C-alpha cells in the first residue's frame, strides 16, 4: 500500500435504517487492514458548530412550517461550512474522511422525495460546491418499508423520517438513478444479514483502494 497516498473522501449514503453506522465500522476495519489509520468522521447535516445548529432546524423545527426550498438552502449552508472548514483541511493533511451523507442525499431526498427541479439542484450544487465531490460512495440500498421499520425501532422519528412511504419510494428511485450513473459509487444490498453487508462493504472498499493505489 502506498502510504504517501493523498487523503480521500468516502461517503456512506442510504435511506433511514440502511445501517450506515454498521457500514462505517466495516469501512474503518478494512481501511485499517490496508494500513490506512488516519481517519476523520463527519455527518451531514452537521459537523461544525453552525452546521449542527442548522441540523437541529432541519430535523426538529416545529415552530413554523419549513418550506422545501428553505430546507434545501439550509442543507447546502451546513454542507459548505463542513466542506470548507473541516473536510478540505483534513484532506490536505492526508487524512481519510468518512462521511455519513453528502450531496447525493440532497439530490435524492430533495430532488426525488421533495420533487424539487433537478436543474435547480444541479445549479445550486455547482454554485456551492464547485467540482468538489467524494472520491468513493457506498450506497446502502433497501426498501423504504424495511428502513422505516428499523428507524422506528430506534425511537422517535425526526421531521424527515416522518414523511410518508411515497416520499421514500421517490427518494430511493432517485438514489438508484444517480448511483448507476456514478462510476465512483457502489450499490450495497442492505437488506442482507449484517455479516453479508459487512463482507460486501469490505470487498468494495478493498477493491477501490487497490485500484487507486496501483
UniProtKB/Swiss-Prot annotation:
It catalyses: dTMP + ATP = dTDP + ADP. InterPro entries: P-loop_NTPase (IPR027417), Thymidylate_kin-like_dom (IPR039430), Thymidylate_kin_CS (IPR018095), Thymidylate_kinase (IPR018094). Gene3D superfamilies: P-loop containing nucleotide triphosphate hydrolases. Pfam families: Thymidylate_kin (PF02223). The keyword DNA damage does not apply. GO terms for biological process: dTDP biosynthetic process; dTTP biosynthetic process; dUDP biosynthetic process. Disulfide bonds: none annotated. It comes from the Bacteria. GO terms for cellular component: cytosol. It is an enzyme of class 2 (transferase). Keywords: ATP-binding, Kinase, Nucleotide biosynthesis, Nucleotide-binding, Transferase. This is Thymidylate kinase.
